[in-house]
Structures are given as C-alpha cells and as structure tokens.
Curated annotation (Swiss-Prot):
The keyword tRNA processing does not apply. Homodimer. This is Ferredoxin--NADP reductase. GO terms for molecular function: ferredoxin-NADP+ reductase activity; flavin adenine dinucleotide binding; NADP binding. FAD binds at D43, Q51, Y56, V96, F131, D295, S336. Binds 1 FAD per subunit. Belongs to the ferredoxin--NADP reductase type 2 family. Keywords: FAD, Flavoprotein, NADP, Oxidoreductase. Pfam families: Pyr_redox_2.
Length: 349
C-alpha cells in the first residue's frame, strides 16, 4: 500500500532559496544568476514587490542609482525585467514555516502550504518580516472573511453590481475605492477622520468622485457588522452624532499591514529589535548558510535603503556560492565581459 508520504512530490532542489519578493529579493535573484547560482523565491504576499507594492506603489523613489525618479511599481517592473534572463520561479502566498539543516549541510525548508525545498543556502530578504493585513477587531467578521469581508481586492469583477464599503484612509483604501466605483453598484469610503494618509492626488480624485456623485464618503468608525443568514446586510458606524446603519454587501477593510517575523523568530538566529544580526563581511547570520539582507538585516549603522540591500545581497550570494559549490572556485567576471550573461540578456530582451 502506498502511504500519503510516498505520494508527496520530491523537494524542490535549488542552490539558494530567497525569502521575499521585494526589490532586494528580486535583485538577489538576478545577481544569483549572474554568478552561476540557481534560485527560487517565496513570498507570503499575493503579488511581487513586497512592501513597495503593498504600501506605496505609486509614490516616487529618488535614491536608486542612475534612475532620477521612478515609482515603486516601476522599480519592481524593471527588476522583474532584469532577472528575466534567469527566469527564477516565484512562489507567492507561501510563508516559510520551518528550516532544518541536514547531515550534508543543506537545508530543508517548508512553507505553510506544503512546498518543500532542498537548498544549499537561505537568503532572507523579507523586509520587516511577513506582512499580514490589520484585521477588524470584530468577532462577527471572522466567518465572513473572503466571502463578504475582505482585506484585499484580488479581482474587481467579484464586486460587480454590489454595494461595497471600503474602510481606511491610506493609499490602498482610496485607490481601491476609486477603482471599485467603476464596477460596483455603489461604493462608500469610510474613514475615522476627514484627513487622509494617502497621496494628495488620490485624495483629490476621491473628493472629485464624491462631488460627482460617483461614490460616497463618511467619517466614522466601524462598530459592528449585521448579518442575515450567512450574508452581510449592513454595517454599524460610530461617529460624533452617535451610531447609524450603512447598507453593505461587501466590506473591504484596508487598514494597512502589520509586520511580523513570524516563524523566522524561532529559527535559532541572533535577533535584536525584530531584525537578524549579520556579519557585514558577507551578511551571514549566526547560523552559517542563512543570510539576511535588506530591512531585515541588523548591524551597526544600518541604513534602511533599497540600494543598501542591493549591495548586501551581492556580498551574501558570493558567500552562498561556497555552500552550493564547496569544491569549485568562483571566478569573478565583470558583467561587461560576461559573454554568457550577454547572450541571456539578448535572448530575453
């Protein structure tokens, strides 16, 4: 008889597992390919780009070398194009749960959705850790999640001809409210105050849409959800005048993301203030073979800059090479003279 364990697919074998698909993780995938390392990327979010895409996709970034200005979204698109010659597999909505070092020095890495990796080194490029949505503090919201209560908008079409309430005051809340007004029967934006933490252009667009009667805006806090059967019917709003009921079929709560190291905190790494201590000569953690780069790395005078993360990833991967190929000497070649790299770039350009 074949057991369930026998039916499991074999572990995915690669040189380096990159944890985090933000800008630093994407550049690390490119750099890994340049020096001859295979890699795969995992990220707990449902899209590539990490904190940049989740928190400020359309805000300008001015401190990337040779790029005078670009949005976070544009930067991520350029980084994806840059690593395209090596086509690194990216596994989204996969949170790394456990790591175990094997007798041969390699690592077995498992995710919360059942993926298993066999890798020579692990590169943590997880920013401030896994980002999870800040959820409503209402017990009645839990059974409605994914059906009537949402913390993201995977597909606009799901809200076609629906009565939708969007809660929040940041870029995500305003941007999604504006997008949803084009497909929903009615959209109401709810925020606890009249001021916003969103881009001025988004606030202006929202106010124009309200004035044009394309959507509504109400100042108030969500105090309760009213359900009939298993469906959301209305929302209780608390404001200065008291409480009122607002009809709703769907609630999209966009209160931002909460950073959480999650299982990484249990990996036996030296950690201070939620960040992983590293050796700045190679950005290796207290456990040989596990590296930390970008915002998750901790060392004296650390600067939380994207360009710093690029540098850290470059050095970390050169050390990781020695774990993947301990008997092979890596020969440094400037990219200008790297014929194989030029061929790959040409083939995908």
């Amino acid at each position: 008889m074949t057991s369930a364990a026998d039916q499991q697919p074999p572990p995915i074998r690669t040189d380096v597992l990159i944890v985090g698909a933000g800008p630093v993780g994407l550049f690390a995938a490119f750099e890994a390919g340049v020096i001859g390392l295979s890699c795969q990327i995992v990220d707990g979010l449902d899209k590539v780009g990490g904190q940049c895409i989740e928190l400020y996709p359309d805000k300008p970034i001015y401190d990337i070398p040779a790029i005078a200005s670009c949005t976070a979204r544009e930067l991520v698109e350029r980084l994806l194009a840059q690593c395209k010659p090596f086509d690194p597999p990216i596994h989204l909505e996969q949170r790394v749960e456990s790591v175990e070092q094997n007798d041969d020095g390699r690592w077995t890495v498992r995710t919360d959705r059942g993926l298993v990796f066999d890798v020579a080194a692990i590169l943590l490029a997880a920013g401030n850790g896994a980002f999870v949505p800040q959820k409503l503090a209402l017990a009645e919201a839990v059974p409605l999640e994914s059906r009537h209560v949402h913390y993201s908008v995977p597909r606009l079409a799901d809200f076609a001809d629906k009565v939708v309430v969007v809660a929040g005051g940041g870029d995500s809340a305003l941007d999604w409210a504006l997008a949803l007004r084009k497909v929903a029967r009615r959209v109401t934006l709810v925020h606890r105050r009249s001021g916003f933490s969103a881009a001025d252009s988004s606030v202006a667009s929202m106010r124009r849409a309200v004035e044009a009667g394309e959507m509504d805006f109400i100042v108030g806090a969500i105090a309760g959800l009213n359900v009939e059967g298993d469906a959301l019917k209305s929302i209780t709003l608390r404001h200065i005048e008291g409480e009122t009921q607002l009809a709703a079929e769907h609630l999209v709560a966009l209160y931002g993301l909460v950073a959480d190291l999650g299982p990484i905190a249990q990996w036996g790494l030296s950690i201070h203030a939620g960040r992983v201590d590293v050796d700045t000569s190679n950005y290796e953690s207290s456990r040989p073979g596990i590296f930390a780069v970008g915002d998750i790395a901790n060392y004296p005078n650390k600067q939380k800059l994207i360009l710093s993360g690029f540098h850290e990833a470059s050095l970390a991967l050169r050390r990781a090479y020695s774990y993947a190929y301990p008997d092979k000497k890596r020969v440094h070649v400037h990219s200008s003279y790297d014929a194989k790299l030029a061929e790959k770039v040409s083939a995908t350009g």
